[in-house]
Amino acid sequence: MQIANLVSNLQSAICNSSDALLSVVFSPACAACDASLLHPTRGPVCESCWTSIVPLTPPLCDRCGDPLPTWRVVSVPLACCPRCRRTRRAIDRARAIGSYDGALRAIVHALKYEGRRSLARPLGRLMRERGADMITGAACVIPVPLHRSRKRHRGFNQAEDLAREMPIAVVRALRRVRATATQTELPAGQRHRNVRDAFAVTRAAAALAGATVVLIDDVSTTGATLDACARVLKHAGVAEVRALTAARVVGR
């Protein structure tokens, strides 16, 4: 009897150990920090990572959204950073929910390159919440398009997924007419040349003459892609082009 009990206890211990091991092996991990994700509430990212995303707060450049020095006294309605004062941009206003680093960078990377499309919903809703002033008064949001070859390779356009979470209509008013090198592989000086003449309007843009629209994308680095899109839209008659992105590389 004692031997039978010992064997039974040993079998139970082995089973419990196996269950524990399986739970560790197969339990989902946070896409941003790899912590065990036992109770996911906002996609495959833990709540700690979501709450660690620090918003970009004023004072911000009204044109590109870069942080301005906190000591600067702004006495004019349009507060622009030195770069935006030197450069003629087609984008009227741009905002991002946070800097492209830490958990936010990991979340965007997981969405964009690892195919974690379920992240688009919570990330898009965070954009909608923190970018409410960009959406107010706009006729629609326009996702930055991928070239058909890249969309076919990736299987989706993350900008379209994010745009669907906005509280106003999504209009596909742009198309990418030329395949371009990935912007992440290029130095800042070449990014504007890389996307020059890469976009064209679709028939849907005809209904947007005189309107205010908001471009939606995942990341803004130098703003070259957003600016190229804005120029095409304004040439087609759009009055004001804003941009809302999930993240921004600050100081580029």
Task: Put a short name on every predicted segment.
Residues 2-101:
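N-terminal juxtadomain amphipathic helix
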Residues 66-67, 71, 76-215, 222-252:
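Conserved PRPP/pyrophosphate-binding segment of the phosphoribosyltransferase/PRPP-pathway fold
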